[in-house]
UniProtKB/Swiss-Prot annotation:
Pfam families tied to this protein: Peptidase_M48 (PF01435)
Designated name of the protein: Protease HtpX homolog
Cofactor(s) the protein requires to work: Zn(2+)
Cofactor note: Binds 1 zinc ion per subunit.
Family annotation (InterPro entries): HtpX_protease (IPR050083), Pept_M48_protease_HtpX (IPR022919), Peptidase_M48 (IPR001915)
Entry-linked PANTHER family: PROTEASE HTPX
One term under GO cellular component: plasma membrane
Signal peptide (UniProt feature, chain positions): none
Binding, Zn(2+): H143, H147, E225
Family of the protein in this entry: Belongs to the peptidase M48B family.
Membrane topology: Multi-pass membrane protein
Subcellular location: Cell membrane
Enzyme class: hydrolase
Length: 297
């Protein structure tokens, strides 16, 4: 059952990433049609922009992310129990030892970052280290180490980059279309019904694609959380530890310092005040759903 769930989550992520590339091509083609009367040119331009965004974000330094989240690097002497648990989980997962950081915050939270296992890092709050027992802390760190092993940070970064690229192209396309006047619209009105349909489709694509891209990005983030929960159980062989850890996380207060959208998606638990919004707009699946999935393993 465990391996079945892991495989299912991986398949869903592949489907969502494919949907992202389709969105990128559609928005590029729409912009190309409106601005240069060329679907191909627009689609190619969109893919190039998406690739540039993805590569530039993937190679951002770990220290930058940790600095944004006020995390301080530690050694084994600073927090031996925490350090050794990270060491043990990395050994079981067969990845290099990540750097270890602590965030001075009373909330219960943790996250991992790094574009590959070779330059990864794990951070936990002081609140988490204080409240969790050893089994629960192993489950949380197993979750974060699984993100590293599964290259989730890279996938999430690509998702953020593609969403940003879609939004950028939509913004540029929309502004240039209006600045260029009604030439494209007049041409289509003087053409035929098909041209008018394509004009409407292209304009709607420019308007709706950014929203669709954000929804796909958030869906990828939620799928990676489910996968990391299941992978943590695979590493620790202790589903009860993961369940108890999630139960404690559900009662955590928000982080005391501001957390930006990109960083929020990295944490094991939503670090900001939980708003009563649709699950579609959440970076994390409901903890109740995560616990329920673990119970059925």
């Amino acid at each position: 059952m465990l391996y079945q769930q892991i495989s299912q989550n991986k398949r869903r992520t592949v489907i969502l990433l494919f949907a992202f590339f389709v969105l990128l091509v559609v928005i590029g083609a729409a912009a190309g049609y409106l601005l240069a009367d060329s679907y191909q040119l627009g689609a190619a331009f969109a893919l190039i922009i998406g690739a540039i965004y993805a590569f530039s974000m993937i190679f951002q330094s770990t220290s930058l992310v940790m600095g944004m989240n006020k995390a301080k690097e530690i050694t084994v002497n600073d927090a031996p129990d925490f350090f050794h648990i990270v060491e043990d989980m990395a050994l079981v997962a067969q990845i290099p030892m990540p750097k270890v950081f602590i965030i001075d915050d009373p909330s219960l939270n943790a996250f991992a970052t790094g574009s590959s296992p070779q330059n990864a890092a794990v951070a936990a709050t002081t609140g988490l280290l204080k409240v969790m027992n050893r089994e629960e802390l192993e489950a949380v760190i197993g979750h974060e180490v699984s993100h590293i092993r599964n290259y989730d940070i890279r996938i999430s970064t690509i998702a953020v980059a593609l969403a940003s690229a879609v939004t950028l192209i939509s913004s540029i396309g929309g502004r240039m279309m209006w600045y260029s006047g009604g030439r494209r619209r007049d041409d289509d009105r003087n053409d035929n019904g098909f041209g008018a349909i394509m004009l409407i489709f292209s304009i709607l694509s420019l308007i709706l694609a950014p929203l669709a891209a954000s929804l796909v990005q958030l869906a990828i983030s939620r799928q990676r959380e489910y996968l990391a929960d299941a992978s943590s159980v695979e590493l620790t062989r202790n589903p009860e530890g993961m369940i108890r850890a999630l139960q404690k996380l559900s009662n955590s207060q928000p982080m005391t310092h501001p957390v930006d959208d990109a960083s929020a998606a990295l944490y094991i638990n939503e670090p900001r005040k939980k708003e009563k919004l649709s699950a579609l707009f959440s970076t994390h699946p409901p903890i109740e759903d995560r616990i329920e999935r673990l119970k059925h393993m």
